[in-house]
Amino acid sequence: MYLIENLPPELWASAVPGVPRRTVRMIAAHIHNARCMWIKMMGATHGVAVLKTVDPRRVRAPELLRALSRSSDGIIKLLQIGIAQGGVVPRAAWQNFPNDVVHFLNYFVAHEAHHRGQLCMVARQLGQRLPGPVAAGLWQWSKRARE
């Protein structure tokens, strides 16, 4: 994940302003751990491998990057299952949105964009604003897709 790769390393253990019990590391780990939860609830019965979550208090950026790659593959498999089932993803026990592929994908886009925005804002609040090319690179979707 481009943003995680480009966060200043000194931010990793920094507390979130106004939420001192939460760190940059914890926000980043939450993205992977949330994916794992959905994969477990929706994909396990369809043969999608249930992944290990990461420790939000101890995970290092390289470990998280590897985990995010695996959980990305799991979410893609859930989308493929939904497409193969006529546009309907498997239902989760406490799902808070309709179980069509469009809503499922939009949920993940919104959830992950929210947390990426948090990471960018926290970096700025802590005086470690992302360099212009890095911030602009967040919007280079075609380039990111090729990476």
Regions found by a protein language model. Give the residues of each.
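Acidic catalytic patch
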Residues: 10, 79-95
